[in-house]
Structure formats: structure tokens, C-alpha cells
Amino acid sequence: MATTARRIWRAVVAERSMAPTLEPGDTLLLLPAGPHGLPWLRGAPRVGSIVVAEREGRLDVKRVAAWPVDTLQTPDALWLLGDNAAASNDSRHGGPVPLNALRGILLFRTGPSGRRGRVS
């Protein structure tokens, strides 16, 4: 993964936690979000968005499953899940992720197999 900046940044998927949506080797273009991001992206992203968050000293790619106001008791936190539950260390194991851990929102994906475009 890459480090964040105040412009579009790039990261490469290293694990299968988001398969089949994202595969190892896919390159992601991300908009900076969270406290380090663009002013209009500092709040919680939409449910269903794919985001990068910093957890336990590493950057993880996950999908937003719930906002703080949806079903969580923890304000200012997101419930993040991997699409591949069997290979994902996500909120099912570690609980909600603080909004200030958010680093980016997926804008575009390119892949070694020619897969490219927006991801939903």
C-alpha cells in the first residue's frame, strides 16, 4: 500500500480479502478521506463504498457496511467488511473502525488481467 496525500493516490491490493471484487495485483486510485483527506470527504462515506483504513499499523481495503448512526453503538466509527469473509480480518473480528482511521475512498481500479473501471 501507499501513503496518503492531499491528492489522488495509488495503492496495490496485496490480499484476497475483497475477492472477487478486488484481486491481488489490482491497482487502486483513491481519493484522500478521513481527517487527512479533502474537506468534503472528512465525514463517513456511503454504505457500500470501498475504502482504505489504517488498522494495527497497516492499510486495509474494505467495504463500508454500516455508518455510526445505522446499527452501531460507537459514534464516529464505521463497520468495515471484506467481500471475501473467509479471508478477511475485518470488523467481524476487530469491531468498528474509527472514522479518523479512514485514509481513502476508491475512485477507480485497474488490474493485471485488464480489469479496469469503477467498482461497485
Regions found by a protein language model. Give the residues of each.
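Extended hydrophobic leader/signal-anchor segments used for secretion and membrane insertion
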Residues: 1-120
